[in-house]
Amino acid sequence: IAKCNYIKYVKKLPIDDHRIVLESQQGKEFGGNIYYIAKELLLNKDYASFQADICVQKEKIDSARAFYEAKGLSGIHFIETNTKKYYQAMASAKYLISDNTFLPYFIKKEGQIYLNTWHGTPLKSLGKSIQNDMHNIGNTQKNFVYSDYLLYPNSYTRDHMIEDYMLEDLCHNTYLMDGYPRNTAFFDEETKKEIIEKYS
């Protein structure tokens, strides 16, 4: 049913050039890379005309809102995953950003731009390296193939993702070696001050 509802909006809705959808861990989280990208979108005047939607699971909506408010960030739209509003956002946003994968029924429309930041450095087995889980890599591969940009913090991560998900002959997109957005925390004076106060 979810797939049918989503496809309906994919076919019907035009792309909104000023809408950005952000999702972390299929809506299970709302921090990490997604938080730092959202923060930039909210605080940088160059993006004042854009609407940023963070998609989270129903039980996470209140804690996500409280988290962003505690950081002094307002203007974010929180959307519950697997709802009408979610399907509409996914089907109409010009820009799609995920640190994992979108749900299996996701289809990228022509004209949409997808940035995948992944969410960590692969120090554990992934993809085909997980012997008893190879049947589950299809959705991850699909998301990587759909991505216009794949962001990695280092060549180790990039090479492992390409190898473990067998992307070499599948992906013809752009690999960005620019570090993870969440690593800006190491250079943020406010964050440094908060940590010192908390642990002093």
Residue spans of the language-model regions?
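A nucleotide-sugar donor-handling region in carbohydrate enzymes
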Residues: A2-C4, T121-G127, N139-S200
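A short acidic (Asp/Glu
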Residues: G31-Y35, S63-Y68, I107-K109, L126-G127, ...
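Extended catalytic core of nucleotide-activated donor transferases of GT-like folds
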Residues: Y35-K39, N44, K71-Q141
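Tryptophan-centric aromatic hotspots in well-structured domains and transmembrane helices
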Residues: I54, Y114-W118, Y165, D169
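A structural signal for isolated positions on well-ordered beta-strands in alpha/beta enzyme cores
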Residues: V21, Q51-D53, L115, Y149, ...
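N-terminal pre-catalytic "stem/leader" segment of glycosyltransferase-like enzymes
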Residues: I1-K85
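Helix N-cap/beta->alpha junction signal
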Residues: V56-K58, N100, P153-Y156
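Glycine-rich nucleotide phosphate-binding loop and flanking beta-alpha elements
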Residues: K28, L103-P104, T157-D159
